[in-house]
UniProtKB/Swiss-Prot annotation:
Gene3D superfamilies linked to this entry: 3.40.1370.10
Family stated for the protein in its record: Belongs to the universal ribosomal protein uL4 family.
Record-level GO cellular component terms: ribonucleoprotein complex; ribosome
Protein name: Large ribosomal subunit protein uL4
SUPFAM superfamilies for this protein: Ribosomal protein L4
Phylogenetic classification of the source organism: Bacteria, Thermotogati, Thermotogota, Thermotogae, Thermotogales
Amino acid sequence: MAQVDLLNVKGEKVGTLEISDFVFNIDPNYDVMWRYVDMQLSNRRAGTASTKTRGEVSGGGRKPWPQKHTGRARHGSIRSPIWRHGGIAHGPKPRDWSKKLNKKMKKLALRSALSVKYRENKLFVLDDLKLERPKTKFLKEILQNLQLSDKKTLIVLPWKDEGYMNVKLSGKNLPNVKVIIADNPNNSKNGEKAVRIDGLNVFDMLKYDYLVLTQDMVSKIEEVLGNEAGKALTE
C-alpha cells in the first residue's frame, strides 16, 4: 500500500499512514477527469439567456413601403433581423445545460484527481484539524507550519461538528484557501446515516495546488471510493 506522512497542526511528523493504492495511487484517467469537470461547469450554468425573434419583438406587421417603384430595397417587415430594433436570428433561448456522469466514472475521476495529488507530493494528511473558535489567525498559523501559507490550498474535512465548522469559517478570509465539509447531515438510508463525501470534487482538487485531509477524511474517502459498491455522491 502507498504511504503518506501523518502530520500534526504544528507541521511535525507524528507517524506514517497507509493509504489505499486503489484510491490514491492509480494511473490518472485524464479523459474522465475532464468529463467530470465539464459536467460540473455545465451544471453551474443558469441557462436563462434569452433573446426575441422577429415574431416576438414589438412593431407593426405591415409592409413598410411598396415592393416596387420606390427605388428602395425590398422589405416586408420592420421586425426583420437586418433592421435596427428588429428580431434576433438564431439567438439564445432558455435551455438546460446540465450533464450527467455515471457513478463509476465519477468515482474514477475522483480517484484519479486524488492520485495526481499523491504522486505530485501535494497531499497532506493531518491527525486532526479542529479549532475551538473561528479565528483566521489560527488557521493561517497552521498553514504556515505546513509551509502552505502562500499556496493555493484545498482543505477537506469529514463531517459537520463545531471544531470543523470553526475551521471552515476561519478560512473564509484567506484568499488562497477553500475549506469543504464533505458531509450531508440530512442524508439517511433505512434510518441510518449513509457515508457520503458531498462537496469533494475534481474541479476544486485541480484548481487548488495542495490538498489537505484529516486522517478521518482519508478513512471516509476510502470507505466510499475503495469498493465498487460504495456511492460517491458529489455535485
